[in-house]
A protein has these predicted regions:
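Extracytosolic ligand-binding ectodomains
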Residues: 4-10, 20-377
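N-terminal signal peptide c-region/cleavage motif recognized by signal peptidases
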Residues: 15-17
């Protein structure tokens, strides 16, 4: 089996594309701090469509090691050597942001798998699959308001992800009667956050939000509990994977976070638009990688496949793959994607919204005994 998968990836990397083929460059963080997220994305490549609009689709998959320099290098390779029609990636916000300037320069659409909110000249070329931080933060703040939380401590990544979550909470918090008591940061590779946690506790918050993703998000949480903090601890949707549950263990009981529908696909009401496709993806993924192996991050890549499946046929009516005209047409088509159902919700993109999610893309869960338990309204 390992040999078969390796052969497939080699074929994806080195097969010479036919002129009419559609070439998709995928930069993922399969090593480095975001590896627990990126591995499930790499495992999802085999479930992407191999033909769209009657044209063969080639996927060129590279690891960026959660590193901005490597991500930019991958993007250059995609553009200069592989002549890709679109770039998908990366897994985390920093490498995604490193790809964006190359996407703009080469006029190549980018679909980020992290909630990277491109601005200015980058905005027209960058689309994003995950839910916006603002959409997810609003759900958490609503829960805080209902539970009488007024003072919120914050400890987040010392990077764009941590910045974006702090900004979202600062902007939306006052309307919910929630005020941040401070702003502590840590690096994705840090082995200890004791000093920062002491400072957070010292501000006497009613609750704490950890602005981190994947396994590193467990570190501040377990340290808060070890140092005696008894209040609620909230997390972002970036923490919703099995490795987070495994690393945090019983200390995570009671953690509250927003998630996409696919995480609790079997508990969705039958009329939820994502239930059928989420069930399809989960059964295929876990059938290959084992029961309980589902990750919402792999599902983001699967949803990217649904989005390009809707946009590419429209672009094919205007130009041939492998040309700037096709890339421009594909960008235009992506901006007009409507009611595309994915595992994480329903996508409606426009010239002002490159995320395309609404409230159908979020739910709140509480961690109990290493499992996600839906918080009912």
């Amino acid at each position: 089996m390992k040999k078969t998968v390796a052969s497939l990836l080699c074929g994806l990397l080195f097969s010479a594309p036919v002129l009419a083929d559609i070439n998709v460059g995928i930069s993922l963080s399969t090593t480095g701090p975001a590896a627990s997220l990126g591995i499930s994305e790499r495992n999802t490549v085999e479930f992407l469509p191999t033909e769209i609009g009657g044209e063969k689709v080639n996927y060129i998959v590279l690891d960026d090691a959660t590193d901005t320099t490597a991500a930019a290098r991958n993007a250059r390779k995609f553009v200069n050597e592989n002549n890709v029609d679109i770039i998908i990636g990366s897994t985390a916000v920093p490498p995604s942001s490193a790809i964006a300037p190359i996407a703009v320069e080469s006029k190549t659409p980018q679909i980020a798998l992290a909630p990277f909110a491109a601005e200015g000249a980058e905005f027209p070329w960058v689309f994003t699959v995950p839910q916006t931080n603002e959409l997810m933060a609003a759900a958490l703040l609503e829960h805080m308001q209902k539970n009488g939380i007024k003072k919120l401590g914050y400890i987040g990544f010392a990077d764009v992800w941590g910045d974006n979550w702090h900004e979202a909470l600062s902007e939306l918090g006052p309307d919910a009667g929630v005020t941040l008591t401070g702003d502590e940061r840590f690096s994705r590779n840090d082995a200890s956050v004791g000093g920062q946690v002491l400072k957070v506790i010292g501000t006497k918050p009613d609750a704490v939000l950890v602005g981190a993703t994947g396994t590193p998000a467990a570190l501040p949480h377990t340290e808060l509990r070890r140092m005696g903090f008894k209040g609620p601890i909230y997390h972002t949707h970036g923490a919703a994977n099995q490795s987070f549950l495994r690393i945090g263990g019983d200390a995570l009981n009671g953690a509250i976070l927003p998630i996409g529908p696919v995480v609790i696909w079997d508990k969705l009401p039958d009329d939820h638009p994502s239930k059928a496709i989420a069930s399809e993806y989960v059964k295929a993924y876990e059938g290959k990688h084992g029961e309980g192996s589902l990750s919402p991050f792999g599902a983001y890549l699967f949803d990217a496949g649904q989005i390009i499946s809707a946009a590419i046929p429209v672009a094919l009516e205007k130009a041939k793959p492998g040309t700037e005209a096709f890339r421009v047409a594909l960008r235009d088509a992506l901006e007009n994607v409507q009611e595309v159902v994915g595992t994480h919700g329903v996508f409606n993109l426009s010239d002002t919204d490159h995320f395309g999610h609404d409230e159908r893309a979020r739910m709140l869960v509480e961690v109990q005994d290493k499992a996600w338990v839906l918080i009912e309204d």
